[in-house]
Swiss-Prot record:
PROSITE patterns, per the entry: RIBOSOMAL_S12
KW Acyltransferase (keyword) present: no
Biological process (GO), any one: translation
InterPro entries reported in the protein's UniProt record: NA-bd_OB-fold (IPR012340), Ribosomal_uS12 (IPR006032), Ribosomal_uS12_bac (IPR005679)
Source organism (scientific name): Staphylococcus saprophyticus subsp. saprophyticus (strain ATCC 15305 / DSM 20229 / NCIMB 8711 / NCTC 7292 / S-41)
Pfam families named in the record: Ribosom_S12_S23
Protein name: Small ribosomal subunit protein uS12
Example of a GO MF term: structural constituent of ribosome
Length: 137
């Protein structure tokens, strides 16, 4: 327990909040070849590998993911939500934050219906998250 005098000399420091998606908080200046801190809600990237991953216990599935090189030259793993996708190796994708709890090392989601990523076909409910247009009557 510190004394009042110790607290006057050096007050308590508040805990600093660590970012859940650190790759979206850096910006690369290619002219100066330096990183700068600049928060962004999404970033554009190019797929370098598309594959499947098995989740942690007790779940069992083949979750689709893509390894993406972002526009700031950082490589990340991003989850591909929804049933079926059209992504290949050089597809350009939009990446947002948001982890997948049962996939270790996957802290980002790919935005469906943006850039080269198509929306989920035949989806009728919860279409907004999956980039699906309103079906014709």
């Amino acid at each position: 327990m510190p004394t009042i005098n110790q607290l006057v000399r050096k007050p308590r420091q508040s805990k600093s909040k660590k970012s859940d998606s650190p790759a979206l908080n850096r910006n690369f200046n290619s002219k100066k070849k330096k990183f700068t801190d600049l928060n962004s809600p999404q970033k554009r990237g190019v797929c370098t590998r598309v594959g499947t991953m098995t989740p942690k216990k007790p779940n069992s599935a083949l979750r689709k993911y893509a390894r993406v090189r972002l526009s700031n030259n950082i490589e990340i793993n991003a989850y591909i939500p929804g049933i079926g996708h059209n992504l290949q190796e050089h597809s350009v994708v939009l990446v947002r934050g948001g982890r997948v709890k049962d996939l270790p090392g996957v802290r980002y989601h790919i935005v469906r219906g943006a850039l080269d990523t198509s929306g989920v076909d035949g989806r009728r409910q919860g279409r907004s998250l999956y980039g699906t247009k309103k079906p014709k009557k």
